[in-house]
Amino acid sequence: MTHISTHRPRIAVIGGGIAGLTVAASLLRAGIECTVYEQATVFADAGAGIQLAPNSARILHRLGLAGALERRATRAHAIETRRWRDGAPLARTELGASCVERYGAPYYLIQRADLHRSLLELLPPGVVRHSAACTAAEERPDGVTLRFADGTSEEAGVVVGADGIHSALRNTLVGDRPRFSGHTVHRGLVAADRLPSLFEVPKVLFWLGPNGHVTSYPIARHGLVHFSAVITSPEWDPEVWSAPSRPEEAAAAFAGWNSDVAELIGAAEGTHHWALFDRDCVGGWSTGRMTLAGDAAHPMVPYLSQGANQAIEDAWVLADLLGAADVDPGPALRRYEELRLPRVREVHRRSRERGHEFHLPDGPRQRLRDRSMPTAERLDDYAWLYGFEAAPVGSR
């Protein structure tokens, strides 16, 4: 059993999503007491899928989740990219055993709720407090006062804001606003037995076309296939982040695409329409007693499928540094930002660029992209991403 130190300041984690629970699990593994404050009364059973690349899967294995992932996730055998109209293959990246051999962990496909449940199982009872919506944090030299929506307050020695792109703590530390990417996405789930020819072997499928793309993959043992159908949408009400939609709306946006795309979207029982926001990847989110993690620190568009993966890296690095720190957490928090900022800036930049490349209209630039893809999508070319080792101190 991990020994919990009584000499370090107690840490408050704001937000009980993937980022917050991974921060908590990593801190507890490092012997640091923490409490997670979650605004929801109960955790929702969210249906969306997550791609867990080897850079985060290795960390989850170290946290003790290898068995849970093998039970609840699916190992992807490949990533395939196809043309929008005729489904012609553009590239195929082999994963499977090659991925494990090259990067030390599989490439997992999992339902978000299953990953969340697995992380929650790592935490002792009482670590997560529900109905605790943090609205403000006031830092002093000797601690932080947290203010909650119900009028109550709590004291903590260190605060980690892992409360997503709407982060209240980020508003205090940075003060910027989310940026609409110009893209929206229809997400849905389909029974896998409706699409037997597409997913006989578990894989991630992309279809690229003018002003849009579709991503799809099976998620774990549920017999379901997740899809995200992204379209260029220059206008969106900034006050509305998501809304229920109908599969017919998504199908209309992809009229004329390959029959596999039409079949995939048409087989969904329901869809949800989301606007995709990010922020510019700036620093300044760590002080002497407060910092951010995950989307609160560096929200990014999902075109490298790295949002959750980068949050998991954040959690491991932060806990590693705090575990090696003395009573004063300030140097560790500032070092955490120094280490993470170059990494997330690169992932953030490449994610934005990939979104533009995915949506090229048919023409010379699209043809150049397509010709280059078979050599640009090799497994070794992802060493910068999947091979990154997020362990600055190595104390664990």
Swiss-Prot record:
GO terms, biological process: antibiotic biosynthetic process
Cofactor binding note of this UniProt entry: Binds 1 FAD molecule per subunit.
One Pfam family in the UniProt entry: FAD_binding_3
Keywords: Antibiotic biosynthesis, FAD, Flavoprotein, Monooxygenase, NADP, Oxidoreductase
Metabolic or biological pathway, per its Swiss-Prot or TrEMBL entry: Antibiotic biosynthesis
Active site: Y217 (proton acceptor)
Gene3D superfamilies tied to this protein: FAD/NAD(P)-binding domain (3.50.50.60)
EC number: 1.14.13.249
Reaction it catalyzes: 3-amino-4-hydroxybenzoate + NADPH + O2 + H(+) = 3-amino-2,4-dihydroxybenzoate + NADP(+) + H2O
Top-level EC class: oxidoreductase
Entry keyword annotation includes Transcription: no
Similarity comment text for this entry: Belongs to the 6-hydroxynicotinate 3-monooxygenase family.
Function (record text): Part of a gene cluster involved in the biosynthesis of thioplatencin (ThioPTN) and platencin (PTN), potent and selective inhibitors of bacterial and mammalian fatty acid synthases. Catalyzes the hydroxylation of 3-amino-4-hydroxybenzoate (3,4-AHBA) to 3-amino-2,4-dihydroxybenzoate (3,2,4-ADHBA).
Name of the protein: 3-amino-4-hydroxybenzoate 2-monooxygenase PtnB3
UniProt gene name: PtnB3
